[in-house]
């Protein structure tokens, strides 16, 4: 059987602000898809598997932010951390509350000049959603 190759454009190619594509390790495609797509409102841009029923490697994105999710054990370990800089962390928080997403730490002001919140995915990866205080609508 021929390998299945990914198609679609890399979101970071269109976003000069983003030059690095982090990868988070996941252990269950179904659980992660439910969390990231249905819970957090990301879209799946593309998926790649070498064969059917093999581990997935995929890109998710939302509002110009993108990262990879991988079931491949050799790519990285669970328990990673990514920072997502957004214009209004409070709007994202309100949306996550409506969607029933459990937020580990609600938005608060940090010592780094940010207003941020922390979400933990089903595999223990942390997503820190941040707004720079200079950009925050007070």
Please provide the spans of the model-predicted regions.
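Conserved beta-strand in the GNAT
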Residues: 68-70, 118, 128
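Core segments of cupin and vicinal oxygen chelate
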Residues: 16, 23-65
